[in-house]
Structures are given as C-alpha cells and as structure tokens.
Amino acid sequence: MSDRDDFRLDGRVALVSGAASGIGLECARALTLAGCSVMLSDLRDTEGQAVTDDINAAGGNAAYTHLDVTQEDQWVRAIVETLALFGGLDVLVNNAGIEIVAPLVDTLHADFRKVMCVNVDGVFLGCKHAVSAMRPGGKAGRGGSIVNLSSIAGKRGVSFLSAYGTSKGAVKLLTKDVAIECAQLGYGIRCNSVHPGVVLTGMADGFFEQHKALGVADTIQGVQAAFEAAHPMGHFGTTRDVANAVRFLASPASAWITGAELSVDGGWAAR
C-alpha cells in the first residue's frame, strides 16, 4: 500500500448526519470521492435526496435516509438501513447541529435546551449506536472512525454563544470519553473532534445577521470583517477545508490518532 492509499476509503461505509447542505454535504462528497459508500441523513428530505442524487450522478455511491438526531429510534433505524444497503459501517460523521446567537440574559431556557438536545444528545446517540455496531461482535464488527463536529466555540469563549459554545465544549469532551473507552476496551474504534472557525455556509449567513442586530457592527460587511480578523490567516474557511480534515480522520492515514481536537480555523485557536 502506498502512502497515497492511506488516504483512500475504498470498501468502507459512512453515515453522515446533517448532510443536506453545508459542511455535512461537503463531507459526504469528500468521502465518496475517497471511495467510501455514504448514507446521507438529514431532516430536510427533499434537499437531502437531491444532493444524494447529485453525488450518484457524479459517480459516487450514496443513499439518503431521514434522521432526527434527537430521536434514539431514528438512529437505530438509520444504522440498520446503512448496514442493510451497504453491508457495514466504518465511519460516522456527527455533523448535525443548530446555533442560537443571543445575549446570555436574553437566552430562553427552552432555546438552551433545544441546542443541547440537538448538538449534544444527537452526538451522544450517534456515538452510542455507531459504537454498538462497529465494535467486535456488533452488526458491522470491524472497528472504525467517529468524527464529531465541534467548533472554535467549543475551545474558546465567544460572546452571544452561551448555548452553542456550551454544547460544542460538551462535544469536545464526549469525544475524548468515547475515544478512551473504545481504546481501553480494544474496540478498534477511534473518535476525534473537528473544530472549525467561521465557515461560509447558510448557518454563517444567519450568524452574521444576528450579530449585526446585536450591534457588533452597523453592516453585515462590518460584522464579517470583525470575525475575519479573528482568524490570523485573514480569511474565512470553506466547507472543503473542513471536509478534508474529516476525510483525513476517517481514513487509515490517521490510524494512531484518537481523542484529538483538530482545529480548522485559520489559526484562531492558536491566539
């Protein structure tokens, strides 16, 4: 096997949550380009099926299933469908998430709980059922890699993101707990987190709008300039930047990496 082959995922199977757009979609594309069969999942079925059709039209091997990550029975079904269609499960990308931008004193408890339910409970449930399938004796039983999407907000304090930052910090530590447990039990399952800075997606558009409303700057361009300056490299990231990191952590090239926090943030976390 060549060094280049270490980055391939031929014969492997992945499940990606929140895959109808943005980072999740780009992760699904990157994994299929590496030779992986991918089950895309999301709440937005029309968009999810459309992008799955696009991936297949481009030569990929992908399917789509509905998944509300807060519902345990839907995780069970999604993994059963993945196993039935593709014959295994080697990679889980826990990408689905939501964000609320608000001052602490204006954040409703119900909204805080909603963010935690999607961003933390969803990752917990995905890890739980993926590990059950991937571990020795499981329905897949050949080990694998779990990649959890956290954020720069899971490593650094950021104003107006008390709910989101708390949830992403929890994802960071849950990742380490899963990594250590799987390693000590000899499951052959690695678990790592990816921490993007600001990436230009539909979620980022809302992020900028909400910060403008909070008076961070008078214009959207001013808000963007303020956040762009937080990245020492001087520009925002792309979904491809994040997807390439996920592909690396999913591949044999990262075989001795588990419990790690991979920052994809133009240097923000290094400040």
State what each model feature region is.
Residues 132, 180-184, 255:
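Alpha-helical segment proximal to the catalytic Tyr-Lys
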Residues 9-39:
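Canonical Rossmann dinucleotide-binding motif of NAD(H)/NADP(H)-dependent dehydrogenases/reductases
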Residues 103-104, 108-113, 227:
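Substrate-binding pocket helix/loop in short-chain dehydrogenase/reductase
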Residues 151:
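Residue(s) in the substrate-gating loop at a strand-loop-helix junction
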Residues 183, 188-190, 257-259:
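Short, small/polar-rich loop/turn modules that mediate ligand/substrate recognition or access, typified
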Residues 2-6, 156, 233-235, 246-248, ...:
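Short C-terminal tail/terminal secondary-structure segment
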Residues 127, 167, 175:
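Active-site helix of classical SDR
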